[in-house]
Amino acid sequence: MLSDLDIAQAARLRPIHAVAADLGLTDDDIERYGRNIAKIDLAVLQRLTDHPRGRYIVVTAITPTPLGEGKTTTTIGLGQALARLGKRSVVTIRQPSMGPTFGIKGGAAGGGYSQVVPMEPFNLHLTGDIHAVGAAHNLLAAMIDNHLHHGNRLDIDPYTVSWTRVVDISDRALRQVIVGLGGKENGPVRQAQFDITVASEVMAILALTTGLHDLRQRLGRIVVAQTRDGAPVTADDLKAAGAMTVLLKEAIKPNLLQTLEGSPALVHCGPFANIAHGASSVLADLIGLHCADYVVTESGFGADIGFEKFCDIKCRASGLAPDAVVLVATVRALKAHSGRYAITAGKPLDPQLSEENPDDVAAGVANLTAQVRIAKLFGRPVVVAINRFPDDFPSEIEVVRQVARDAGAFEVVESFVFAEGGAGGYDLAQAVMAACEMPGKFTPLYPLDMSLRDKIETLATKVYGAARVEYTPEASRQLTRFEQQGYGALPICMAKTQLSISHDPKLRGAPSGYVFPIREVRLAAGAGFIYPLAGDIRTMPGLPAHPAAERIDIDADGRTVGLS
């Protein structure tokens, strides 16, 4: 089979104005970046206010292996299938960071015959939004150190500065640095760090904002440090938020691309899913819902982490609620959850994974059962999509199908969208359209007036399967301080591994009865959530021994090769 890049480069793309017209957008509504990419002016939201709202579908998954289970591919393939059935559909997905693109995971444009194109700019720079986020973030960092250098009028305690610097490349050497070396003219010496840009609170803010003025207010609320008296210091206190907003004036506009089959795709924002909420922008979804019959979006990683945050954070920010949920499962991942196989990114797969073994699938299906249960907590029907691989066997598929039905899935269908594009997603599309018509009420997991500790314990026990939560003394002090400072009504955005429903990536399947540890609690006041840290979560990845960057090059004709 052709590589993803070969397929993408062979595609005949429609002019972007024609793609926009499918959504009812005019030339005045878009700002073109060449023939195949455009930004959408936010004024369309005012013009389309009276349009009926389309159906809202969110794609999630079982706990993934490091290789991923095809969630983005399924999202795109479902959008293509709906379009083939004569529905006006649009997919809304995240823009990938260049860190994973050059590292282990590769790009995030989907795969096979269900991709967003043009693939190269999608994975590299696109319209520069991530760079704008980095510039806004680093401007605030510079203004903090500048304030300390020029007298520290706000009486900031330098040891409490929590605002980092960012770069959109995985670079472990920058995780811990010393700034201010070389004499007084370079500012006070202090320990600092770099994060990858998509872990920035600015990225989370951009993804959750509902407009330019809301963006300005959110940026102003960012807390960067404490005074020596313990009061929070904000970006507004430093008079940085206005300039940060100006840097993001273009980045706030969603990007319009297309799928391989020419249907519209909105690509916007890319917050980390295990640190932030891990979903594409509220604005892209709002525009899509005013323009299309069906909007298909995705949440990060498994239902325990990405879908829960989608419901408890993103839906609260947008005022929207999903009509149906698609949960992607693979035979490969369920075999891995049996504990009998190790899947490591960058290493060859165990050949036995390709052999027929329904018993191994049955040994790992507890994760599927748990993730369907988690997805159903929020009140909407769940369609399980079995993402088919060529080496799957009917006996293994039947195990997955039966377990998903027993877990309460509305429907279980096989998906062939990787190999067949939209044509391989007809059954999935039909099931999803039927699910959207089901009665039921969307319900967040917890009320916002619940205490921070009670919210955390609700997540740990109802979603992660823990028996109880254990806090370090520092985490307990931080929770008390945040509530005293007036942040107690914020939702929780748990920072934890994506490789297990628990905090420990080694715990496969559906762990239960364990102690869920919280070692630290941080505040993202601008984004509007509290994020406790459970386990070892890195905000700056490192490159593997053989990063994907080694394979990427230019051929004799100037075409990109090796990008995946």
Swiss-Prot record:
Pfam families: FTHFS. One of its GO terms (biological process) is tetrahydrofolate interconversion. Belongs to the formate--tetrahydrofolate ligase family. The lineage of its organism: Bacteria, Bacillati, Chloroflexota, Chloroflexia, Chloroflexales. InterPro entries: Formate_THF_ligase (IPR000559), Formate_THF_ligase_CS (IPR020628), P-loop_NTPase (IPR027417). This is Formate--tetrahydrofolate ligase. It comes from Roseiflexus sp. (strain RS-1). NCBIfam families: PRK13505.1. ATP binds at T65, P66, L67, G68, E69, G70, K71, T72. The keyword Nucleotide-binding applies. Its EC number is 6.3.4.3. It catalyses: (6S)-5,6,7,8-tetrahydrofolate + formate + ATP = (6R)-10-formyltetrahydrofolate + ADP + phosphate. Keywords: ATP-binding, Ligase, Nucleotide-binding, One-carbon metabolism.
